[in-house]
């Protein structure tokens, strides 16, 4: 016999070597004449599976390459952002070092030390600002008090000057006394002249006496002191006399009295 009988004889046809009906189970006993067909079917199915697996591998490789490219671009962006951030931070630290005084950064090289010294500098500035504010407030109080006092003094002075002017206009302060009294006494360097005059004569009294002494070739004024006592002025003049010259004290006194 050329072939082994099968249990079932499937009613199916082969076209182009492909099995169109698989509704029947093939018998384990297949004719030797059908071996070529079976191998052809197996080869074609395996080829299609290989093609499908190659497509899957190619697609997976493309996806992997795409993911790698995305990951690399993200890394580059991150590096650029980090580089820019570090440059900005470095410029800020340089600016901070320029703002700090030398005594705060002397011997300090690290960035952390600079930050600590910057905090200390800010605290010191706050303390100084507080002290200056307190000093300003004290000065303001003193100025306001001084202004008030000055205004009160000006009012009092104006009232006194007006009353004094009215008093002088009506009567002199040296009623019953002389307008000017002169005492001339000898001293170690020459003579000492003490003049007491009232307010009305004070303006011209001292200048006239000094002018007279300057015109006299025998006298050289050493010192001149003035003081006020109540309504009169006291002038003390010390004048040096040239060597070998005699001074008539009474004559000098009369000259001063008659000025």
Curated annotation (Swiss-Prot):
One of its GO terms (molecular function) is DNA-binding transcription factor activity. One of its GO terms (biological process) is regulation of transcription by RNA polymerase II. Keywords: DNA-binding, Nucleus, Transcription, Transcription regulation. It comes from the Eukaryota. It is found in: Nucleus. It holds the Pfam family HLH. The keyword Nucleotide-binding does not apply. PROSITE patterns: BHLH. SMART domains: HLH (SM00353). Residues 73-125 form the bHLH domain. Transmembrane segments: none annotated. GO terms for cellular component: nucleus. Homodimer. This is Transcription factor bHLH125. The lineage of its organism: Eukaryota, Viridiplantae, Streptophyta, Embryophyta, Tracheophyta. The gene is BHLH125.
